[in-house]
Amino acid sequence: MNLTGKKVILHDMSLRDGMHARQHQITLKEMVDVATGLDAAGVPLIEVTHGDGLGGASLNYGFPAHTDEEYLSAVIPKMKQAKVSALLLPGIGTVDHLRMAHQLGVNTIRVATHCTEADVSGQHIALSRDLGLDTVGFLMMAHMVSPEKLLEQAKLMESYGANCIYCTDSAGYMLPGDVTSHIERLRGELKSDTQIGFHGHHNMGMSIANSLAAIEAGAERIDGSVAGLGAGAGNTPLEVFVAVLERMQVHHGVNLYDIMDVAEDLVTPMMDQPIRIDRDALTLGYAGVYSSFLLFAQRAEKKYGVPARDILLELGRRGTVGGQEDMIDDTAMNMARELA
């Protein structure tokens, strides 16, 4: 693999996907400290919202320590070079949330849907473009569909106005060959000025290899998370990925030592538990289950006495997707009854 001279835009997820690992309880001070550290390190894009995006505060997904508006209002004025993005899932976030984010100075809106449901994103993508925002179509759980199906859905998002399309490995299930086939198909068939992105999780230990495969196949934006803070076993650990890109002579614009320090001095001390590939996180990747289900399954284990990995395997067998968090408790309860 020769990536010498390629250029990539790195996008940090620690303050959005990392919310899952912190049960959405990141404080305003932690949010500002990490964001300003990333900004100083040269990270160009930083995502800030509830783990499930704008409007995610709910009984189903979890109530955060502060509102999206409070987080964005605290972070955006402190940025010197970095731009702030916000995730929005239609059906959770609304056009009013989108307008609020725009008014507060958000630069990028990432409209996320399940990989077969791009048709629900049209209103939000169109409004985002009308507001002049960098607009991303974010196709989640991409491992569940063929490259051809992902392309079909990507073309819908592109037709609504998205200027960037993401192949999102929400479960950390994909292997480098899978990433290559999906990204190559997108790059070969979408408009030449539509950027391609990749979002990985580390549940099978493949996030860096997958991200490199994505760059080789034509991706220009890569998500990561400083210290890997994210759902499941976390996202692509950004400081490690920066070191790899340095070795491979890929242009990324981030200071390696500075981002190492953010990971070590700011993010690692924030963790409620180590972000690692334990048996439950590994099961997420192996079974192809949405990464944010991890803590829900572990809580269900304590409640019903069914091992979390068995719950996750059953959820994978049933083909559950993001947004079906309510099924975790039901599944565990039914499994406990069968074992009684």
Swiss-Prot record:
Q: Report the record's Gene Ontology biological process terms.
A: catabolic process; L-leucine biosynthetic process
Q: Which UniProt keywords apply?
A: Aromatic hydrocarbons catabolism, Lyase, Manganese, Metal-binding
CDD domains reported in the protein's UniProt record = DRE_TIM_HOA
Instruction: List ligand-binding residues for substrate.
Output: R16, D17, S170, H199, Y290
| InterPro entries found in the cross-reference section | 2-IPM_HCS-like, 4OH_2_O-val_aldolase, Aldolase_TIM, DmpG_comm, DRE_TIM_HOA, PYR_CT
What Enzyme Commission number does this protein have? 4.1.3.39
* Active site, per annotation: H20 (proton acceptor)
User: Which source organism?
Assistant: Shewanella halifaxensis (strain HAW-EB4)
A Gene Ontology molecular function term of the record: 2-isopropylmalate synthase activity
Q: PANTHER family in the record, alphabetically?
A: 2-ISOPROPYLMALATE SYNTHASE 1, CHLOROPLASTIC-RELATED, HOMOCITRATE SYNTHASE-RELATED
Q: Which residues bind Mn(2+)?
A: D17, H199, H201
What family is it from?
Belongs to the 4-hydroxy-2-oxovalerate aldolase family.
The name of this protein is 4-hydroxy-2-oxovalerate aldolase
Quote the catalytic activity from the record. Answer: (S)-4-hydroxy-2-oxopentanoate = acetaldehyde + pyruvate
- Which residue positions hold the site described Transition state stabilizer? R16
Gene3D superfamilies reported in the protein's UniProt record:
1.10.8.60, Aldolase class I (3.20.20.70)
Q: Give all residue intervals belonging to the Pyruvate carboxyltransferase domain.
A: 8-260
Give the matching PROSITE patterns: PYR_CT
